[in-house]
């Protein structure tokens, strides 16, 4: 069992490679190479890798509750590799979001930083926003918030993500863009039918 949804209470070595790989987070990380037998892939990792899919090994609720950081790792892999998260895995991520409260701020910051720097950051955070809203709840109000302005054709959240995706690959710039309109829904006003 795991302590605080992060660390195993104890580590037990197993003699079976299959059993060892079964304990991994995602199928793409649950493969091994044997110099005589070649690729050992019991859980479809190669197919998921080739198809660009992030999928938990076995029961996704069990994998994510063992180590809640896996929720943010799935998001990071989706961003870095420009992969999709398999629907059952994403639904389990959403069900287990509250476990992120057990994760240290340093680990969350590390995963968020890598996510923001990924080549697929727009699609990852647009398609799978809930983990971001759990760790930065102030951003939730931007999702779907229409700006009603001819200079802003996207809602605040999509505008934010497009800004990040089109910015230089500089973490400070991307962090600034993540927060640059976070307060807009709270101070929005209209004058002559135009949003400000």
Language-model regions, residue ranges each:
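Catalytic cores of the polymerase beta-like nucleotidyltransferase superfamily
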Residues: 1-196
């Amino acid at each position: 069992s795991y302590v605080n949804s992060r660390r195993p209470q104890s580590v037990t070595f197993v003699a079976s490679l299959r059993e060892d790989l079964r304990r991994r987070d995602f199928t793409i990380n649950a493969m091994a190479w044997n110099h005589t037998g070649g690729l050992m892939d019991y859980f479809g990792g190669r197919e998921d890798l080739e198809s660009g899919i992030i999928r938990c090994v076995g029961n996704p609720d069990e994998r994510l509750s063992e180590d809640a950081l896996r929720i943010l790792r799935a998001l990071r892999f989706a961003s870095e590799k420009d992969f999709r998260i398999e629907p059952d895995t994403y639904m389990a991520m959403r069900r287990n979001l509250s476990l992120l409260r057990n994760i240290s701020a340093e680990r969350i910051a590390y995963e968020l930083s890598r996510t923001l720097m990924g080549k697929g950051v727009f699609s990852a955070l647009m398609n799978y926003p809930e983990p971001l809203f759990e760790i930065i709840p102030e951003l939730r109000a931007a999702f779907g918030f229409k700006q009603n302005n001819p200079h802003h054709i996207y809602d605040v959240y999509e505008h934010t993500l497009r800004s990040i995706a089109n910015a230089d690959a500089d973490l400070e710039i991307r962090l600034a863009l993540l927060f640059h309109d976070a307060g807009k829904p709270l101070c929005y006003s209209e004058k002559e039918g135009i949003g400000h």
